[in-house]
A protein has these predicted regions:
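S-adenosylmethionine/decaboxylated-SAM
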Residues: 1-161
Length: 161
């Protein structure tokens, strides 16, 4: 069972809460998000079910925090599971940091990896609101597919066209 979980960006905290509930009592989550207000929306629910002690919330930009932690050695743990749901243009940067922090045989999961099916659509057919994230997601998929250090399993969960 995973004990250490790293979460990048979480909106209102629903999946953060469900993950905290699933972790053992001594499980730890490092949650990084530049929007404290979003965390505060879910905080009363996190407190109500008694899992606040599992969550270390960091109100900041994930790239700079992780670079600092890796450089200064302030992050003295390996993670069993990393979930990235952040700015799509930085997914490859997040991957490079995550690979240094996740245990051997650990899991790194990315949200929107199929980007509502747009990654296999002709560019002209992609709705405008999906265009901004489409190219970085395609680049990440190519990057991961060519990386011999990892195994890939893609699962579509509610990310449908």
């Amino acid at each position: 069972m995973p004990r250490r979980y790293w979460r990048l960006v979480f909106f209102t905290g629903y999946s953060l809460l469900t993950t905290a509930l699933a972790l053992p009592h001594d499980g730890q989550i490092v949650a990084i998000d530049p929007n404290r207000e979003a965390f505060d929306v879910g905080l009363p629910f996190i407190q109500k079910v008694g899992v606040e002690h599992k969550i270390n919330f960091i109100d900041s930009d994930a790239i700079s925090v992780l670079n600092e932690m890796l450089t200064n050695g302030t992050l003295k743990m390996e993670f069993d599971f990393v979930f990235v749901d952040a700015d799509k243009p930085n997914y490859i940067n997040y991957h490079e940091q995550a690979i240094k922090l996740v245990k051997v045989r650990g899991v790194i999961a990315y949200d929107n990896i199929l980007w509502y099916g747009s990654v296999v659509s002709n560019e002209e057919e992609v709705p405008e609101f999906l265009c901004i994230g489409r190219k970085p997601i395609i680049e990440l998929n190519k990057y991961l597919a060519s990386n011999p250090r990892i195994e890939i399993a893609q699962i579509s969960i509610a990310d449908v066209a």
